[in-house]
A protein has these predicted regions:
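A conserved mid-protein helix/loop that constitutes part of the nucleotide-sugar donor-binding site
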Residues: 20-24, 208-224, 245
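Nucleotide-activated donor-binding/catalytic signature segment of Leloir-type glycosyltransferases, i.e.
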Residues: 244-308
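Donor nucleotide-sugar binding/catalytic pocket of nucleotide-sugar-dependent glycosyltransferases
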Residues: 142-184, 261-264
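Conserved donor-binding/catalytic core segment of Leloir-type glycosyltransferases
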Residues: 8, 194-211, 217-220, 234-236
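Aromatic "clamp/platform" in nucleotide-sugar-dependent glycosyltransferases that forms part
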Residues: 321
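A short, well-ordered alpha-helix in the C-terminal region of glycosyltransferases
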Residues: 388, 395-411
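A short helix/loop element that forms part of the nucleotide-sugar donor recognition site in Leloir-type
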Residues: 180-194
Length: 458
């Protein structure tokens, strides 16, 4: 019996984005089984890119390789997600199964493909809020299988589709192997340039509207005022400038510029380092060039350095109005850092699995663009929980840290997640090739005109 042919659609697995990481780790496990013929259709990936040389499976880059293709690529926004090349990739690889793990608008074109009857379609959308848009639910209903990033998302789709979506449970991501606890946290802080007595509340979030930096800064300001602590700093691994918040304006508004650190990455020497905010560009501490900027997806820190940052944190906090998953929570837990998250969307599932602290939601509001409910956090409650955490003894915090790591090992492991995909792929009965890609062309001939002249009534 021939091997099943599986096409994974997502972001190029040599990138360090969340989607890329998920596909890379799952595909590595599945490829090692030697049970399937595997291919990757990579958004933001390019054929011939040297970063893809070591990829062992078949690779289809989505970016144009010729100047003549650029105009076609730029015509439709969804081409960046693969719409313009999808069918040519299908005709070359002839998959039995097509898999996509992204947002609805990144894969909905696959449902519209003329070749849809020829492949089993399994998706894992980022269900980050409720209620879900009716168009999204309709598309999910037409998939052959639907995984979810979280148990919360699974329950939302089950409820809102009245059981009509073929939900397969959750298949959550894990952290990269680089995220490990350090043996001596105090020495690690010294190595990173800080006093061992310095405490950190840390967050790793992109500078987007749904990441609630204004509320986080407000809660942290209130914590400083109510606790009287001067040894606890806020560390934000985020980008600026971006399409999100005006970070320097917020720092000034809440008077925390001298208490908040960021990660800068140098475009010249590729080094990263922590520093207080000093504009979008600053002098690199490593090589001295003036080309260091706040870390971003395009110019970011390595997993190894991000792990070093995470291991400085005493407490990790995820402060967003909604999350499809919120991977940094799990990455922090992998480093043994206790976690707090807003008690809404996927964060509700993750924070309970990790044994962390759910942060109270003050209210929900309906978002204009999507009709989904988004969370407004209770910043006073968050400030109170921050104070309670840092009032704990060192022994209590160490116990929390160990339990957080144990919960990470229990709930978030790549081999367990890949096994869920493997079990699904093995359960799919593939149709004979002659009924799909090898089927005869369906040619529709128009009715031949039998008269040279016809009346209007005819």
């Amino acid at each position: 019996m021939r091997k099943k042919r599986i096409l994974f659609c997502g972001e190029a697995t040599y990138l360090n984005t969340g989607y890329a990481t998920y596909l890379r780790e799952v595909m590595k496990v599945l490829y090692a089984t030697q049970k399937y013929e595997i291919a990757e259709f990579a958004s933001y990936g390019k054929d011939g890119d040297p970063r893809g040389v070591d990829i062992p499976w078949k690779f289809y880059g989505n970016l144009p390789t010729k100047d003549s293709q650029q105009q076609q690529y730029d015509e439709i926004p969804t081409n960046q997600f693969g719409e313009w090349k999808f069918e040519s990739v299908l005709l070359d690889f002839l998959p039995d199964i097509v898999c996509d793990i992204r947002d609805f608008w990144m894969f909905e074109y696959q449902e519209r493909s003329a070749f849809r009857p020829y492949f089993n379609w399994v998706i894992m959308p980022t269900v980050d809020a409720a209620p879900q848009n009716e168009q999204w639910l309709s598309t999910f209903c037409n998939a052959d299988g639907v995984f979810n990033y979280s148990q919360w998302g699974h329950e939302v789709l089950e409820k809102e589709s009245n059981g009509n979506i073929k939900c397969l449970g959750s298949a959550p991501p894990s952290a990269d192997a680089a995220y490990q606890p350090v043996q001596d946290k105090n020495q690690h802080k010294i190595n990173m340039g800080f006093s061992p007595s310095t405490k950190f509340i840390g967050t790793v979030m992109r500078n987007q509207r749904r990441k609630l930096f204004p509320d986080l800064f407000d809660a942290y300001r209130k914590f400083l005022e109510t606790s009287g602590r001067n040894d606890v700093y806020l560390y934000c691994h985020t980008s600026y400038p971006d399409l999100g918040w005006d970070i320097p304006k917020l720092l000034n508004k809440y008077k925390i510029a001298s208490k908040t650190l960021f990660t800068y990455s140098c475009a010249d020497c590729n080094s990263s380092f922590p520093a207080f905010f000093s504009d979008a560009k600053r002098k690199c501490k490593i090589c001295g060039s003036k080309n260091a900027g706040l870390a971003s997806v395009q110019k970011g820190a390595s997993y190894q350095y991000l792990s070093s940052i995470m291991n400085m944190f005493d407490l990790y906090i995820q402060y967003a109005n909604s999350e499809g998953f919120g991977l940094p929570q799990v990455e922090a837990a992998a480093c043994g850092v206790p976690v707090m998250s807003i008690d809404y969307s996927a964060m509700s599932s993750v924070i309970r699995n990790l044994g962390g602290t759910p942060l109270k939601v003050k209210t929900l509001y309906s978002e204009l663009e999507t009709g989904c409910d988004r969370a407004v956090p209770d910043n006073d409650y968050t400030a109170e929980k921050m104070k309670e955490f840092f009032d704990k003894s060192e022994q209590e915090i160490n116990t929390l840290s160990k339990n957080t790591r144990l919960n990470f090992e229990k709930y978030y492991q790549w081999d367990k997640t890949a096994k869920k995909w493997e079990d699904y792929f093995d359960s799919v009965d593939i149709k004979p090739f002659e009924q799909t890609w090898g089927s005869l062309p369906r040619l529709h001939q128009p009715q031949p005109q039998t008269k040279t002249e016809m009346s209007s009534s005819e």
